[in-house]
């Protein structure tokens, strides 16, 4: 399952105001620039462990940017397992499902989010098919590569998983 082999970054803005959305992107840039420890990870487990070991550092990086921009928002960084709908990031489509993620919430965390994949390093570098193949099996690579016919299949997965979730 693709959801078991990737580790996501999920940043939620305080609100949907332009200022809060701009702040979210500044926090994103600072976190991605400072968190070079993800580029050395050789497995999804290593990436999750790197995030957990550096939560305080990640929080402080975000907090510094927020203060620098003149805001007094609280910020939290934590590793979570959450449901995500089908998403597209550059040349990769991730099917709906439960994923582990480094989640950074700015203030109320009520604004639109920004996300990417920390492992394999899709948001840290220009990820190629060869990069993905090093960590995902052939079927998983084919599944997540953008192409015709995937939207319907992913929608079916979303519907199935939402029904399953409601029955539990």
Stretches with model-predicted labels:
Residues 1-2:
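Membrane-interface motif at the C-terminal end of an N-terminal transmembrane signal
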Residues 5-55:
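Early exported N-terminus immediately downstream of N-terminal targeting peptides
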Residues 6-12, 74-78, 101-105, 115-117, ...:
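Soluble periplasmic/extracytoplasmic beta-strand elements of cell-envelope proteins
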Residues 12-16, 80-82, 107-109, 119-122:
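Solvent-exposed coil/turn segments that connect beta secondary-structure elements
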Residues 18-20, 86, 113, 125:
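Intrinsically disordered, low-complexity acidic/polar segments
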Residues 45-86:
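Amphipathic, coiled-coil-like alpha-helical scaffolding segments used for oligomerization/assembly
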Residues 92-150:
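Soluble extracytoplasmic domains of inner/organellar membrane proteins
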């Amino acid at each position: 399952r693709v959801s078991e082999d990737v580790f996501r970054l999920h940043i939620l803005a305080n609100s949907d105001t332009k200022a809060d959305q701009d702040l979210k992107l500044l926090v994103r840039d600072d976190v991605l620039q400072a968190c070079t420890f993800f580029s050395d990870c050789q497995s999804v487990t290593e990436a999750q462990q790197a995030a957990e070991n550096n939560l305080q550092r990640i929080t402080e990086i975000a907090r510094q940017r927020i203060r620098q921009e003149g805001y007094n928002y609280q910020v939290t960084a934590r590793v979570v397992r959450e449901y995500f709908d089908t998403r597209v990031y550059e040349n990769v489509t991730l099917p709906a499902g439960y994923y582990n993620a480094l989640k950074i919430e700015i203030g109320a965390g009520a604004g639109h989010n920004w996300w990417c994949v920390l492992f394999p390093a899709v948001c840290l570098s220009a990820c190629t098919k060869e990069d993905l193949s090093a960590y995902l099996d052939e079927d998983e690579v084919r599944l997540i590569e953008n192409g015709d016919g995937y939207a319907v299949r992913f929608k079916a997965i979303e519907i199935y998983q939402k029904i399953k979730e409601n029955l539990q």
